[in-house]
Amino acid sequence: MAFVLSLLMALVLVSYGPGGSLGCYLSRKLMLDARENLKLLDRMNRLSPHSCLQDRKDFGLPQEMVEGDQLQKDQAFPVLYEMLQQSFNLFYTEHSSAAWDTTLLEQLCTGLQQQLDHLDTCRGQVMGEEDSELGNMDPIVTVKKYFQGIYDYLQEKGYSDCAWEIVRVEMMRALTVSTTLQKRLTKMGGDLNSP
């Protein structure tokens, strides 16, 4: 019995070690969280998007995200992480909490945080020493500019209900694209430790 227990402990330690993959596998749970976040965003709808047509804006969702074939595996993970982090930051603001149903907003922020926590498990192992260089990586800079455009738009519109509705619809689009990127990463091997 002691031998079996020792063997199991060794397997767990190896799985979570630098060469293991248990901690960095893009799990089904991550995909389920992503789908749930999209459902929550859909439920947050307070206005008819048609009533806000005059406030529409093309935020220029980065083509690197839309056409993810352009991203290599080593770029896809940081772009996905940045997209989720920026989404969380957008909805975890004072202005956001004034615009949305508090319960739904808290559930959305919790769901985004769960996705980030899962990816954080992998982040150090996947990016390691390169982390400091990622801030300068073109796709990451593009994602940051995209979100800065959303922040600028909200400020320009005075954080109006219609502006938030337009942003909600845009974020559904962005999170749908990030879900597609997650699927693509999974098809690339799912184990983010593999070369």
Swiss-Prot record:
Q: Which residues form the signal peptide?
A: 1-23
- Predominantly, its location class is secreted
Q: Does the keyword Disulfide bond apply?
A: yes
Write out the GO cellular component annotations: extracellular space
What tissues contain this protein? Constitutively and exclusively expressed in the mononuclear cells of the extraembryonic trophectoderm.
Task: Please give the SUPFAM superfamilies that the UniProt record associates with this protein.
Answer: 4-helical cytokines (SSF47266)
Q: Where in the cell is it found?
A: Secreted
The role this protein plays is:
Paracrine hormone primarily responsible for maternal recognition of pregnancy. Interacts with endometrial receptors, probably type I interferon receptors, and blocks estrogen receptor expression, preventing the estrogen-induced increase in oxytocin receptor expression in the endometrium. This results in the suppression of the pulsatile endometrial release of the luteolytic hormone prostaglandin F2-alpha, hindering the regression of the corpus luteum (luteolysis) and therefore a return to ovarian cyclicity.
Q: What is this protein called?
A: Interferon tau-1
